Amino acid sequence: MSIGYLALTQAKPALEAQHGAWRSWYHYFPWEDWRKGRPEILDSSIEPRLKEWAARPPQRPTPAHPVSRQERVRICFGFDGAAWDEEKVLDRFELLYEAGLVEEASRDGREAARLWSDRPRLGAPMRFDHRRVLATAIGRVRAKIKYRPVIFELMPDEFTLFELQRTVEAILGPHLHKQNFRRLVEGAGLVEPTGEVKMRTGGRPAKLYRFRREVLLERPAPGVRVKPGKI
């Protein structure tokens, strides 16, 4: 049994003195990053190989599964017209592991991994089951920002709405519509203007906002309820 905890923190310069380095979680899960549109790795590497794996007969008898391999692939990765669910991070990684398509499957001696002669590099591997733990954490925080104001724990005390939007996008994966995002955040009463502005190079000053803490007492689930692709 392994238990993982996710801690939210802001980068500190002291980390460099400890010979550590920050890495985007998309370094390990590149197929989850939709900020510039559908990731190319899905079409070039993941979809054809997962469909090939799904069509293979099982190497040994396996317990009956209520959903076929083909349907699991379609549902988890949004292939063939299915919707992409940004919260299924762990489901997607476990499917790639089961299909033998990630380095951890080869390292663990999984039979499915030995069947690939052209296995691509799908993100950077991690030690032990750490990439699985990270996948679990990403899925949980993607779900939680929709009903709890955890996004503001990653923001400075004062921020612009553009900075807030970029942070939400970095967590959820996709690009969000600027005006719709602003209407949603302001309409939900999550932020309030500070009365100050932030100067930007080559543009108008941007208003500064802060998290409106009174919202915690006004309703039980004050999150940023965005749905990628629909905002």
What are these regions (language model features)?
Residues 175-195:
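Charge-enriched amphipathic alpha-helical scaffolds
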Residues 188, 196, 208, 212-214:
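Charge-dense, extended regions
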Residues 152-168:
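Short acidic, hydrophobic short linear motifs in intrinsically disordered regions
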Residues 5, 164, 171, 179:
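The catalytic Nudix box helix
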Residues 1-134, 138-150, 167, 197-202, ...:
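Unchanged
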Residues 146, 161, 181-183:
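Charged, low-complexity intrinsically disordered regulatory/assembly segments
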